[in-house]
């Protein structure tokens, strides 16, 4: 009782509380700087209509005409308001489906064990991390003034799992020939999708009469766009070919 009535103790308690609050705020700011939790929520702001339309664009981009992103007050709108906006819902669901589908395939081939799913998940995540790091490095070397956010890069890189899942499913139902036909279609579709979306991120300054960048910088960005798109079929083949015998 005497301790709590002591002014010095009360002052120390208040100072400690204020220090804890300031430390927590500083830590939250530090975490938010590198891992913007609030911003991540926007990438999951989807609805059924968006998911349906996005899957159509991913699987048949040839009929999609307008690839421009929509903005409101200088900020991109949530995915559910713009089919061209990147999201993390579809890549996440596609990735989880890919892992479960791998388990199903291993089960039908009498190769299933719990460790197999863990190994498959680690392998896929490792390749995704490497891809994201390489794209980030490429964007840095291309000297982009407005580089893409990490969640955005993860979203675009993760869309490939939609095509992978459908290609493996075709292999299960139609055999290896069906797998390669489906993989060819999905790969071509994803190449076009990546070129159309990446050019809006990587080549925005090339439409401004070349004042903002040199010819060599513009060529580097064009090569980067093509390279990102061209490597996708190889990754899709690598991540799925062993699942179809």
Language-model features and meaning:
Residues 1-50, 56, 60:
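Terminal intrinsically disordered, low-complexity, charge-rich regions
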Residues 9, 18-22, 29-33, 37, ...:
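A generic structural signal for ordered alpha-helices
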Residues 12-13, 19-20, 58-61, 83-94, ...:
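Alpha-helical multipass membrane-protein architecture
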Residues 10, 49-50, 73, 162-167:
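A generic structural signal for solvent-exposed, polar alpha-helical segments
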Residues 20-26, 104-106, 120-121, 162-163:
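Short, functional N-terminal and low-complexity linear motifs
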Residues 136-244:
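Hydrophobic alpha-helical transmembrane segments and adjacent short intramembrane/lumenal linkers
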Residues 36-147:
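Selected alpha-helical membrane-embedding segments in polytopic membrane proteins
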